[in-house]
Design a protein with these regions (language model features):
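Structured loop/turn residues at beta-strand edges in well-structured enzyme cores
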Residues: 1, 42, 104
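N-terminal beta1-alpha1 ligand-phosphate binding loop
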Residues: 2-24
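Conserved beta-strand elements of the Class I
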Residues: 3-6, 47, 75
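FMN-binding flavodoxin-like domain, especially the glycine-rich phosphate-binding loop
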Residues: 24-28, 49, 54-184
């Protein structure tokens, strides 16, 4: 099985998560691509797509790339500088899945906490200290906490999630069964 991981990263969090997933995969062939450096030809059995969340979904570069993908087994993962168990995080992952689900088979998804880039923090600070897109004391505290993400545990969980889904795909293929739709 050949797995290609393609990611877009602003602060380095998505790159770190992609690298951790890549390192953990035990497959015949695997390739890791930074979308900013190279737009790969997708010839693998599985494509894992990682992005940083911008405006509630994939960043612009990944969004444009996702629009070109067709007929693939796809996994989607993302990082954001907010709580991974929040509705915002789930919606951000669902937005990425929605971009690929009609033309591809979705194997699964994963959303992870990440740090906010310094440029984004500067924009929030320019908005003052009141409101959701400001440098409120609560936001400042969250940004400080998120500096430690993704953690090794989060990376391991993402790697486990996709390793499990690849195993499931192979099990089904051996039995000539279709991968069931996943509603993310």
């Amino acid at each position: 099985m050949k797995v290609q991981i393609v990611y877009s990263s602003l602060s380095g969090c998505t790159r770190r998560l992609a690298q951790g997933i890549f390192d953990a995969l035990n497959v015949d062939t695997k390739e890791l691509y930074d979308l900013a450096a190279h737009v790969p030809e997708l010839d693998g059995d599985v494509v894992l797509l990682g992005y940083w969340v911008d405006k509630g979904g994939p960043d612009a570069a990944m969004r444009a790339f996702m629009e070109t993908i067709e007929g693939k087994n796809v996994g989607v993962f993302c990082t954001l500088a907010y709580w991974a168990d929040s509705a915002h995080a789930h919606n951000a992952l669902a937005a990425g899945v929605a971009m690929v689900k009609d033309k591809n088979r979705v194997l699964g998804g994963y959303v992870c906490n990440g740090i906010m880039s310094q440029a984004m923090i500067a924009r929030f600070r320019a908005n003052g200290t009141v409101g959701p897109h400001s440098a409120s004391p609560a936001n400042e505290a969250r940004w400080e906490l998120m500096k430690n993400h993704p953690t090794d545990a989060e990376i391991a969980l993402a790697a486990e999630r996709f390793t499990e889904r690849l195993c499931f795909l192979q099990m089904l293929q051996k039995q000539n069964l279709e991968y069931p739709p996943i509603n993310i």
